[in-house]
A protein has these predicted regions:
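Nucleotidyltransferase catalytic core that binds NTPs
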Residues: 1-153
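Hydrophobic anchor at the beta1->P-loop junction of P-loop NTPases
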Residues: 157
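P-loop (Walker A) phosphate-binding loop of NTP-binding proteins
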Residues: 160
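Conserved lysine of the Walker
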Residues: 165
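Hydrophobic positions on the alpha1 helix immediately C-terminal to the Walker A/P-loop
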Residues: 168, 172
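Conserved nucleotide-sensing/catalytic segment adjacent to the nucleotide-binding pocket
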Residues: 196-245
Length: 334
C-alpha cells in the first residue's frame, strides 16, 4: 500500500495546496496532511484543518499544535523539522512526500519516501499564501468558496422598521466596495401581502431564500458582507403576525445566532418614515423593545447605533478598524 504526505500552514488553503493533495490522491492509496499552527494568519488551526477535511473527506488530517516555528535550510532546522514530523507520524509509513518547496529533498529522505515536487516554479498555480494574505479579494480565484467565505467578516444590522438599516447597509457597502444583502423578507411581503398580511406558511419560505442569496453574495464580497436583517428579524415578524413562528424559521433563526461576526442594532432616534407599509411610530417603538428582548434571550452581543447616517457609519467603521474575525469581541468593546 502507498501513502502520501504533504504538510504546511495552509494559511490560507489555496488552489496550489489543492493541487498537491489531488496529485497525492491520484497517485497513492492513502493521503495524510500535517497542518501547523501559525501566527501569520488569524484563522485558527482547527478552522484551516476543517477546510481540508470538508474538501477532501478521505484525507487524514493531523493537527500540529506544537510544531517548530523555524523555517530555513540549515542543518539544525532540518534536523528539528524531521524529528518533529517523524514524531507526529508515530510510526506511520510514508511512501511519497508531496511538496513544492526546497524541503522536499531532506524531508523525503528522512521519511524514506519518494520526493514528489509539484509545481515548484508556481507555473500551474501562480499564487502563494503571502500574496493571498495581502488581499484575499484580489486572489479569490485561487481560493475555494468554502475557504473564502470563512475569510469574510459577516455583519448584520437589526432594528424595527424605519430605523435606517437599509440606508446604512447600502452606504457601508458602497464605502467599502463590497456587497450588501437587502432584506428579502420586505421584498417578499411587498409581492405577496394580502391586506398587509402573509401566512405562516409563507413566512417559512422567507429565511431559506434569504440565506441562499446571502451565501451567494458572501462568495462575491470584499472583506465584509453587510446584511440588512437576517432570519431572526423574519422570526420576530412571524411571531408578531401569528403569535408563533414555524419550525423551519425557528431553526434558521437559531442558526443565525452564530452565523454573523458582528451585530449592530439601529436605534429609533431618527424620524419615523410613515409609509403605507408600516404600522406607526408606536408600533416601531414596541417592536424595537421586542427585538432587544429577543437578543437578550439569545445572548447575542450587539452594538447600538444612534445619530444620523454619517454618525452611524463612523460608529461602525470604528468597530471594524479594530475587529478581528477570529479575535475576542470583548477586546474591542472594552
Amino acid at each position: 500500500m502507498t501513502r502520501g504526505l504533504t504538510l504546511g500552514k495552509f494559511a490560507p488553503f489555496h488552489r496550489g495546496h489543492q493541487l498537491l493533495i489531488e496529485t497525492a490522491l491520484a497517485e497513492t492509496d492513502e493521503v495524510v496532511v500535517l497542518i501547523y499552527a501559525t501566527e501569520v494568519i488569524e484563522v485558527p488551526l482547527q478552522v484551516r484543518a476543517n477546510w481540508i477535511r470538508q474538501l477532501y473527506p478521505s484525507v487524514t488530517v493531523i493537527e500540529a499544535w506544537d510544531g517548530p516555528d523555524s523555517y530555513g535550510d540549515t542543518a539544525e532546522i532540518r534536523s528539528e523539522q524531521e524529528a518533529y514530523i517523524l514524531k507526529k507520524l508515530n510510526g506511520l509509513a510514508i511512501s511519497h512526500f508531496y511538496s513544492s518547496e526546497f524541503y522536499g529533498d531532506h524531508v523525503s529522505k528522512a521519511l524514506g519516501a519518494v520526493d514528489r515536487r509539484i509545481d515548484e516554479a508556481r507555473l500551474q498555480v501562480p499564487i502563494s499564501g503571502t500574496q493571498l494574505r495581502a488581499n484575499y479579494f484580489a486572489g479569490k480565484a485561487y481560493l475555494s468558496e468554502l475557504v473564502y467565505r470563512d475569510l469574510i467578516i459577516h455583519v448584520c444590522f437589526l432594528g424595527a422598521p424605519s430605523t435606517g438599516k437599509t440606508t446604512l447597509t447600502r452606504t457601508l457597502a458602497e464605502q467599502h466596495h463590497t456587497e450588501w444583502m437587502p432584506e428579502y423578507g420586505a421584498e417578499f411581503w411587498l409581492t405577496h401581502q394580502v391586506d398587509r398580511r402573509i401566512t405562516l406558511e409563507q413566512f417559512e419560505t422567507i429565511a431559506p431564500e434569504h440565506n441562499r442569496r446571502e451565501e451567494k453574495l458572501r462568495a462575491q464580497a470584499n472583506t465584509y458582507l453587510f446584511c440588512d436583517t437576517n432570519p431572526i428579524t423574519t422570526y420576530m415578524f412571524a411571531r408578531d403576525y401569528h403569535g408563533t413562528p414555524g419550525p423551519i424559521l425557528t431553526e434558521l433563526a437559531k442558526q443565525a445566532e452564530r452565523n454573523y461576526d458582528l451585530f449592530f442594532l439601529c436605534d429609533t432616534d431618527i424620524p419615523y418614515a410613515d409609509t403605507w407599509d408600516r404600522s406607526g411610530n408606536q408600533k416601531r417603538l414596541c417592536f424595537q423593545q421586542q427585538i432587544i428582548a429577543d437578543l437578550a434571550e439569545r445572548k447575542i452581543p450587539y452594538v447600538v447605533l444612534s445619530g444620523d447616517v454619517e454618525c452611524r457609519v463612523e460608529q461602525v467603521n470604528a468597530i471594524l478598524r479594530r475587529f478581528k474575525k477570529y479575535g475576542n469581541l470583548l477586546d474591542i468593546l472594552a
